[in-house]
Each structure stands twice: as C-alpha cells, then as structure tokens.
C-alpha cells in the first residue's frame, strides 16, 4: 500500500537537506535534498508527449489531492521554466484553471483538489525543460521537439490498439507484454449464434448479458468468429470498432507521408501496407468473416457477463455469442469498410477490391432490410454515412443519390455524416 503524506509548513521551505521521521516504526525515516528549482513534485503535471515549438499553447497544471486535509490552493505562487543548464527561460504566477464552480457529471467537485494553470507557450526553442513552482518543486521533464512529440503520441495510441487484438498471441518479437492467443476456435473456444442484434442491445431494448444468456445452448456454432479488437476493459468485439478502422483509413489517405510511414513494430510491419491500415484491417477482416452470404453483417461477439474476477482473455470461462445481423450494423460496417478499401487501394489493390465488394454487399443488404423493430432512427442516421463512403470509393451514382435523398445536413450531427 502506498501512502501520500502531506506536510504543511508555516513558511516556504528553503533549499535544504530534509529528514522525515515518524513517531513509530511503521514508516522508515526518509532523507532527501529539497530544491524547489529541481526537486520532483507529483503536484506539477506536464505533458508526457511534449510539445512542438509552434504549438499555440504549452501548459502544465498544478494540483494535488489532500486526502482528508484541507484543499491546497497554490494560485498566485510563482512558477518558472528552467532549461537543462539551469537557466530560467520563462516565469509567471499560477492562475486558476476553472473560473466557475466545478460540476463534474452533475455531482459537484469530485476530486476535492484545486487546479492551477501554467501557460509557457512563449518557450519555443527545442530542448528539455523543467516546469517548477516555488516551494513545491518541479514536474517531470518536458520536451519541445520539431517532429517527435505528436508522432510519438500517434505511435503509442496505435501500438495500444495492437495490444487490444483478439485472436493473436503477443510475444517478445512485437511487445514487452507477452500473452497467449485469446478467443480463437483452434484453442477450443466455442462461439454460438444468438438471436439478439447488437443494435437492439445498443438501444437498451434488452440487456446484452441477459439476452445472450437466454440463447439456446445448442445454437449453431459460428466457426470463424475470431479476430477484431477487444472493447475497453473486457473481451467484446462490436461493430462500433469499425469507426476506428475508418479513422485510421482517414489518417493514411489524408496524410500518406506522415501516417503512412508510422512503423508500429507489429507482425505486418514491412509487408507494403502502412501499419495503421494493417491494424485497422484486423477489425475489418473480423467482421468480414462474420458477414453472411447475402451481405448482412453480424454486429460482433459478446460474452454473457463482465470478465470474471481473476480470469484473463485467454482463459475466459464465459459463454460467447455472435449477434444476429441488423441494418444498423451493416451500415456501420459498409461505411468503415468502404473508407478503408479506398485508403488501401494504392498499397494492395486486390485486397482493397475484396473489401469494397464486401462493403457494397453490406450496404445493399441494409437497404433491402430496414429494421423490423423501433430502433429510434439509428439505421436511418447511419444510412447516408454508408452511402457517402460507398460513393467516394466506387463513384456509383446510386450511392450519391442516396446521400442526397437521406442526409439531414441541418439537424444531423456532423460526426454522423462522416
């Protein structure tokens, strides 16, 4: 157990050697040298990614949770930015971060910690710096670099997606995290066909766990339901993840030199397809395997409950099921797959053509099979997104006409129109 000890002094501490002792043997004595211009303080938060020289704002925050003590308000304290040679290159006083009462999730101030802001946007020279607060200390070193800060962030996010892959072993050749293959039929995992659709679950018509648990235990086994990316903190793989595939496609299509050159150290690295697209294909291929011969898309795989305590993805004891097909899931897949095929075409035309044909089949099935239940307009809202993506990828005027006839450019949220 880690305990944070907050000590309040009547006056700011000078730079000095400090020894902390406790009245009993429960806490061992701690000795350290305190210098507010170099000593680390967890109260000073800087960007782990760093900044570009021309970033409009470069900020750090100062905040610490006092436990059961009184809130610690540091507004007005002096701050400095110090380079590697110890030179002060910027300074100022802490400003309050929030200018109005804090109301988090409608529940007031959940942290009980005041937050102050440091804006050091005037620092533009590349290098490594410390952001320090008088009588408090300094945050972790922050770097200003021309090319590495945002690129590093993009690589970390995409690498995190690789670690969310289902149906693949993680080994030392691609990761410091090693785990067995998870949720793969060759390892004895049995996944059966459910009657409930992911759209019905998404619309809260029924709870997913309860509906799946009611599935016939002898229902049809779906042989090829492996792959995709795990969802959040559990092992679901839902068609929503095609949004990620579509966003990855946008990155590579719009910025081929930058996003297309990112090397993620994944199994596909070096195969001629940008790594960002290769990882997106891991999800697209999963849903293509779930596609029925008539084009319908089944909306993913889910188990009958949240992960069991002390279990892991490769030893998941819960029963797993494939959702039944529905038009909303088919539109979502059609939009993402068409966008991905469009981005993939310059690198692997054959695979792109197969993916685009799959996307068209999904869109055509959704057009011919409107919802048989009240879906609160979800399929209708997704329809123009799929049509726009299919038109962009194929040039087929029928999809253009469908966009024109169905898109609500006045009331529909921009993200719903792609």
Regions found by a protein language model. Give the residues of each.
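Extracellular distal adhesion/interaction modules in secreted or cell-surface proteins
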Residues: 1-10, 100-101
């Amino acid at each position: 157990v880690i305990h944070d000890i907050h000590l309040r002094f009547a006056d700011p501490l000078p730079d000095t050697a400090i020894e902390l002792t406790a009245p009993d043997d429960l806490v061992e004595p701690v000795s350290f040298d305190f210098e507010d211009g170099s000593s680390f303080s967890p109260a000073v938060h800087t960007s782990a990614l760093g900044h570009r020289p021309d970033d409009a704002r470069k900020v750090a925050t100062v905040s610490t949770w006092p436990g059961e003590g009184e809130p610690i308000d540091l507004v007005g304290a002096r701050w400095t930015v110090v380079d590697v040679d110890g030179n002060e290159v910027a300074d100022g006083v802490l400003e309050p971060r929030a200018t109005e009462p804090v109301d988090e999730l409608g529940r007031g101030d959940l942290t009980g910690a005041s937050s102050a802001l440091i804006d050091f946007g005037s620092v533009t020279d590349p290098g490594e710096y410390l952001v320090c607060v008088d009588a408090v200390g300094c945050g972790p070193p922050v770097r200003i670099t021309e090319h590495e800060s945002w690129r590093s962030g993009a690589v970390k996010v995409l690498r995190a997606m690789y670690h969310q892959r289902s149906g693949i072993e993680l080994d030392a050749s691609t990761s410091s995290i090693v785990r067995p293959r998870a949720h793969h039929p060759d390892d004895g995992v049995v996944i059966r066909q459910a009657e409930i659709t992911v759209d019905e679950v998404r619309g809260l018509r029924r709870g997913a766990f309860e509906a799946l648990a009611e599935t016939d235990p002898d229902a049809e086994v779906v042989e090829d339901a492996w792959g995709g990316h795990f969802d959040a903190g559990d092992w679901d793989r839902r068609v929503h993840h095609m949004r990620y595939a579509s966003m990855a496609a946008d990155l590579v299509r719009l910025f081929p030199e930058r996003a297309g050159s990112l090397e993620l150290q994944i199994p596909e690295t070096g195969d001629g397809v940008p790594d960002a697209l290769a990882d997106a294909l891991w999800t697209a291929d999963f849903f293509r395997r779930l596609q029925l011969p008539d084009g319908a898309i089944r909306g993913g795989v889910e188990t009958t409950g949240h992960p069991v305590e002390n279990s892991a993805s490769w030893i998941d004891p819960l029963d797993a099921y494939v959702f039944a097909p529905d038009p909303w899931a088919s539109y979502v897949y059609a939009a993402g797959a068409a966008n991905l095929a469009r981005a993939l075409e310059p690198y692997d035309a054959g695979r792109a053509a197969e993916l685009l044909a799959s996307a068209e089949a999904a869109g055509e099935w959704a057009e011919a099979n409107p919802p048989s239940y009240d879906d609160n307009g979800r399929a209708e809202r997704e329809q123009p997104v799929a049509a726009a993506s299919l038109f962009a990828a194929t040039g087929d005027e029928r999809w253009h006409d469908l966009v024109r006839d169905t898109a609500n450019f006045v009331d529909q949220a921009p993200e719903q129109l792609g």
